[in-house]
Amino acid sequence: MSKTNKLALLPVMLCFFAMGFVDLVGIASNYVKDDLHLTDATANVFPSLVFFWFLIFSVPTGMLMNKIGRKKTVLVSLIITLFSLLLPVFGESYGLMLVSFSLLGIGNALMQTSLNPLVATVMKGGNFASTLTFGQFVKAIASFMAPYLAMWGAQASIPAFGLGWRVLFPIYLVIGILATLLLFSTPIEEEPIEGKASSFMQCLSLLGKPIVLLSFLGIMCHVGIDVGTNTTAPKILMERLGMTLNDAAFATSLYFIFRTLGCLTGSFFL
């Protein structure tokens, strides 16, 4: 890999870290439920809403990426993510959190769709699989940090500036701004798209291929396990063992710690 590609890989890996911001929705929904005294059904709207936008925006994002390029699409996703992280700093009302989590889901849908192709552009065919797996390792670091940051903020173990558990939003906001600036300032040469871009229906028709359909179902199950563990693990410990939310928050981090180790190990195998 050339020196230029190595320099471009740093902001791309930081974008993977920003991709992990979406996993804060699990612990955040538990804290919002506790603060606003919501029912389980009402609180579960938050994680469902975040990942609902994957269904809506994944295919259109691919079409957008063909028009404006991979790097610009990732930058758009980062800007939307920054707005989603900024809103909770100003309050914790139900409506505000709905808008924040919706923007977080939209930004992450754009990022998930465009970041992997950007890695392919940077790597130019070299160690692509292991680089993607290492990127998932970086993403998982952000995922397991979120519950600890929220817990430390709620317990005032770190300066929370009156935000309590919501201090994780400005912390991730600063990292997101850094990722945006680094990616914007890093020159990445993208090859021009040859031929006609695929239409919406042509993209959906790929599900008619068994391997694509099975991969789609596998990813859906994987995301379901992620979201389910992320959201319900603290609830189960609170209900069965009588733990407080601050004490039970470690369950989500424990899951992501082992996922982080798995991604790191996988990057070496690949």
Functional labels for PLM-detected ranges:
Residues G126, T131-P187:
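Helix-loop-helix hairpin linking two adjacent transmembrane segments in secondary transporters
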Residues L7-D40, N116, T229-P234:
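Extracytoplasmic
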Residues V45-M63, S253-G266:
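Central cavity-lining transmembrane alpha-helices of secondary-active solute carriers
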Residues S100-F137:
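Cytoplasmic helix-loop-helix junction between adjacent transmembrane helices
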Residues V25-G26, G208-C263:
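Extracytoplasmic gate region of multi-pass secondary transporters
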Residues I56-G95:
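Conserved MFS/SLC helix-loop-helix module at the cytosolic interface between two early adjacent transmembrane helices
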Residues G95-F101, L214-S215:
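Short hydrophobic/alpha-helical segments at membrane-entry points of transmembrane helices
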Residues M1-K3, E190-S215:
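Juxtamembrane intracellular "pre-TM" segments in multi-pass secondary transporters
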